[in-house]
C-alpha cells in the first residue's frame, strides 16, 4: 500500500530543545514559508497546521502560503461551536478554490476547558460532541451543494447554502481524531479519515477495529491516519542520541507543571498520551523505536519514531499493515527535520505520487449576486 506522508507547520514555536529557550527559533512568516516550500519540494503530500490559542490562525497561514507553493495541501482546523457551520463551509469552499483543490479540513472539538471557555464555548465533553455532530452534518451538506434546514439541540439553521462550490467534488475530505466512544461514533458516521495519535501498534489496532466496526454498521468505510513525531538519522544510535538531546534541558518542575496543566483536559486522547510516560524521563521507549519523550511537555501528539531510515520505515509499515495509509509527521526543528525525512526516510517508503492538481475551475460568469441570495438567470426570450 502506498503511503501519504504529511509534514507539520509549527505555528506555536520551534527549536532544538523541548521546554527551553535555548536553541529556540523565531517562527515568523518567512520561516513558515521556508518549511512549506521545503515540504512542497521534498514530496510531502501536505502539511498539518495546528490550532488553538498558542498558535497562529491556521486558515490565514494556509491562505498566505498558497501562492508560494505548487502542490502542497493544507490541513486546517474546523472548530465546532466557535464558528457557524454555514460560514465555515463558505470559507472552506473559498480556500479550496483559491488553492485549486489543495484544502483539507481537520475537525477539532477541543479538549482544554479553559481554552474553550475563553473562546465562548461552555459545553461539557458529551455536549461538545453533540454540537460537533450537528456542525459536521450541516457543513458537509452545504459544501455538497444542498440547501439545509436544520433544527438541532445546539445548532439551528434555515436555508443554509453555498453559491460558490469547492474545486474538490463533492467536497474536500474531512479528517478527525478522538479516542472517546463519542469521538469514534462521530468518525464512523461523518468523516473520511480517522486520525489517532502515535500509540503502540497494539493499541492502535484496537482503535482501528472499533472505528471500522462502527462505520461498517452504518454502511460506511473510513480511512485511517496517524500523527507522529520522527527522529531519523543515518544510524539508529545517532537517532537515539538526538532524542536524548531533545529533552536534555527539561527539569522535573517543567515536566510536572506541564502534566498538571494537561490533567485538567477532558480529552481521552490526551489522557492516553500521558499514561504512556507517567510524567517520568526514564523508560520512554514504550514500544520498539517508539519514544514518548515529546509528550512530557507537549500536548497532543507526544510520541516519536526513532531510528535510521530503514528502521523507521519498518515501524511505519507495521502501522500500515493495520490499515494506516496516512502519516502526519513532524520533528524539531521542523525545517532541518523535513530535509532529514525527505533524504533519509523517503527512499525507504512507497509513497503516493504527489501529482499536480487539475487546472483551476473558473468561476462561471454570472453577474453580481442579487440580494445576497440569487444568481442572475438568463432573461427569457419572448
Swiss-Prot record:
What UniProt keywords are attached to this protein's entry? Answer: Flavoprotein, FMN, Monooxygenase, Oxidoreductase
One GO term of the biological process aspect? alkanesulfonate catabolic process
The family database entries (CDD domains) matched by this protein are listed as: Alkanesulfonate_monoxygenase
Q: Which Pfam families match?
A: Bac_luciferase
GO MF terms, alphabetically ordered? alkanesulfonate monooxygenase activity
The record lists the catalysed reaction(s) as: an alkanesulfonate + FMNH2 + O2 = an aldehyde + FMN + sulfite + H2O + 2 H(+)
Domain of life per record: Bacteria
Its Enzyme Commission number(s) read 1.14.14.5
Subunit structure as annotated in this protein's UniProt entry = Homotetramer.
Q: What else is known?
A: FMNH(2) which is absolutely required for this enzymatic reaction, is provided by SsuE.
* HAMAP family, per database record: Alkanesulf_monooxygen (MF_01229)
In the record, the note on similarity to other proteins reads: Belongs to the SsuD family.
Role description: Catalyzes the desulfonation of aliphatic sulfonates.
Q: What is this protein called?
A: Alkanesulfonate monooxygenase
What is the organism field in this record? Serratia proteamaculans (strain 568)
Q: What is the lineage of its organism?
A: Bacteria, Pseudomonadati, Pseudomonadota, Gammaproteobacteria, Enterobacterales
* Gene it is expressed from: ssuD
